[in-house]
């Protein structure tokens, strides 16, 4: 392991908020992890933000003054109060076992993954050396990476927490931390999370990617030059990175399968109805009503 790199000191500024956690460790400085780091540095200048990632990402983070300590090995997290696992889902699960060697109570460990059952089950299988509380901030973007991170990414957005029997004090502190970032913490069961997010997030992503692939293959580059805003708006998510979504689909395949089956059934229904259009009005009117109910 390379020695940790320490960021030069920064002047403290009064924020009116005492630190909830004195030492914050973040593993994975993508859009979510980077945004948490930036927000924490703004909110609690006297807290120490420690990050674990690859060398290039850490160098960028140091240039952006997003972190205080950069390292490539989780051993630096031995004394932290809060660990945030912000890597892809299956990598977070592997990291839990590594943390078990270094992190000790009363440390709180959370993650930011888009599925919850697998990581919660993995945490349950470990000895109780730290308190794990699953987490999922619903404040992402189609453009990922540290370069797109910003300190206000979570403002006004839900941040789902799956405590799974965690102690009240740990949950209280993590809830306060999430609230301070501007998010709206909400408690949800891990199974319910995966079922709901299959429809709210995973199905829209797969639909957007499949639609863009079908359209692109059918009309080619010349045809796409004629496209209007409708196609661009509908397929915005098609720019999302496949490496992240491979983990999401693998750890929520059953619930995503249910969601896909329901969409396929609806499309098949519309396909059969094309010559007469009897179902078209019902579907369009129902969809318009639900669209108005969206709070985003």
Language-model features and meaning:
Residues 74-108:
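Rossmann-like NAD(P)-binding element
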Residues 97-147:
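Rossmann-like NAD(P)(H) cofactor-binding subdomain of soluble oxidoreductases
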Residues 2-73, 78:
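NAD(P)+-binding Rossmann beta1-loop-alpha1 motif at the extreme N-terminus of oxidoreductases
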Residues 151-236:
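Internal alpha-helical scaffold of NAD(P)-dependent oxidoreductase catalytic cores
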Residues 220-290:
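Interdomain hinge/lid region at the active-site interface
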Residues 23, 48, 131, 158, ...:
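Residues at the starts of beta-strands that form the adenosine-phosphate
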Residues 86-88, 113, 163:
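Glycine-rich, N-terminal phosphate-binding loop of Rossmann-like dinucleotide-binding domains
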